[in-house]
Amino acid sequence: MRILLLLLTCITALFMSSCGQGSGDNPDKTMYLNCGRVKTLDPALAADLASRNMVAAFYDTLLQYDYTARPYELIPSMLKSMPELDKSKKVYTFKLRDDLYFSENACFKNLAKSKRKVTSQDVVYSFLRIGDGRLHSPVFWMFRGKIEGINSFRTATLKSKDNSLYKKGISGLEIIDEHTFKIYLTQPDPRFLYALAIPYASIISKQALEFYGESFSENPVGSGPFKLREWVRDYRLILDRNSDYRVEYFPQAQNLADRKKALPLLDRVVCYIIKQEVSAWLLFLQGGLDLSAISKDNFDNVVGMGSELTPALAKRGIELLQMPEFQVRYVGFNFNDPLLANNLNLRKAISLAYNVDNIKTHYNGQMIPAEGPIPPGVAGNDSKFKNSYSRHNIKRAREYMRLAAYPDGIDPKTGEALTLTYDQNGNSSAYRQLAELMIKDMGKIGIKIIPQLNNKSRFFQKLRKGKFQLFRLSWIGDYPDAENFLQLFYSKNAGSCNRAFYQDKEFDRMFEKIIPMLDSPQRTQKYKEMVKYLSTKCPWIFESFAISYQLNHKWLENFVPHDFAFSRWKYLSVDAKKRAEMKKSFKPLSLKELRGK
């Protein structure tokens, strides 16, 4: 045990020493984080969570969410005021602020600041680029079929050899002047504005894109709160405060002095990509990271029986936040596979055999069992509804196997056990444990599971090509509306967010009917009816909604749980004096102390 603790202390010391390297001129206002692996800093390509969140630090969007308002509320970001909607409910008029500038960068060749001003032309260019078929933007779903002419533009670009179509534009994006533009929708869509707050819809500089070319994804030039100082792939990103960021304040800041300071409050953010969870954990304990998630394997050392922080960590000045996530986890069936698509009874049997209680144990209780795709707290989630196929019941599952023509799991064509593949997007011990649970559950009804543990690249390649049978995945909501989760079953989204390739004319009819509906009890009732309908078709095994546990040191200020605070870092601050004082008293904690023994 002593050797283990000594080794862990050495690892911590190594990371602690690296924190000081290149940490900047003013470490007092520097925040240190462990971030996920960033693939790209191109907003139109940043479909993964780590990239999306990082993009939000460098770029700005037309709208944002009020950081403290509940329920969630959209407010202007790059706009002077909320956009005006005409009587037809299809035309929005936007007016940009006049203090928006792209950050200083080599691509502007020392041009005057006024030449870096963000204009309506930049907005239109950014949105057209998402629609450019040659880019294959994975976030085109935001605009597809919603903005007049965007679908035709996408088709035309696939045949174009230059960018002349950008000059021609489309009817759905009209420039009035440098600060005013209009967006014409194909039909009323009360949720359209949500898309304009997602980092995918960030406004980029055409000049920067042309200057950097293929390396644009590594050189962000935005009008957001931070600018890139350094990016060493798979190791570290360093972000500096963007002094040209528009004037914005946070009147609810913990520190009274910070309430009068323009955002961002931090001078620097250092993001490490630490692959080993134990290294990140030890670095956090010694004050080298300002906040930390809690890994599955470390949960018992951190959280006690009453979901409270263990005494040793509480004494260290660490705070625990529990937050239900706007996320649904599920096991999907491939509806491109006739075996699964054409046999509802088989899907019912598999759903009933899946033991969610074991999954809950696997996650240390950090989840809420799901009855459908809509998370708790969202209009359309019916707390009284019970999905008939979400209750673990082996007896019923075996009966459905018989009705599916696979009695006791035997394939009548071969006389052997029905065999299905099961894909996951990771190969760690946690994924292996989940695979073992699946093998055990399906074995009880005679199905043989062949687990496929993939890296993320291979996993999503399989999903795009439909080369799978069963797969486990999650969906993190992009905006606070049930439609964002129901779209995962819409046939026109098959191959993109509809990973199961589910196609159902009746569901499509229901989905298209709710698109133009305003928020109302009637719309909420429609959502509930759609969930009940899906429960009878078993397109997924509706597994769970995640609950995240996060740890903060007390010197980190202004952290507010928020599912859509994409640019959260601009509000955060650190009390440097408190950090220095607290770290002086830190000493390595033994496993005995961590466990409160």
List each model region and its residues.
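Surface-exposed binding/hinge segments that line
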Residues: 121-206, 223-232
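Extracytoplasmic/peripheral linker and loop segments enriched in polar/acidic and small residues
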Residues: 20, 315, 348, 352, ...
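Aromatic- and charge-enriched surface segment that lines or borders ligand/interaction sites
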Residues: 81-142, 182, 280-283, 340-342
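N-terminal lobe/hinge region of extracytoplasmic solute-binding protein
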Residues: 34-87, 221
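A structural "hinge/loop" feature
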Residues: 36-56, 106-112, 138-139, 190-201, ...
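Append "and occasionally in soluble cytosolic enzymes with long acidic Gly/Pro-rich linkers
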Residues: 240, 251, 341-440, 444-445, ...
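Periplasmic binding protein-like
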Residues: 33, 284, 441-491
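Aromatic-rich, solvent-exposed beta-strand/loop patch
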Residues: 103, 184-203, 220-279, 303-327, ...
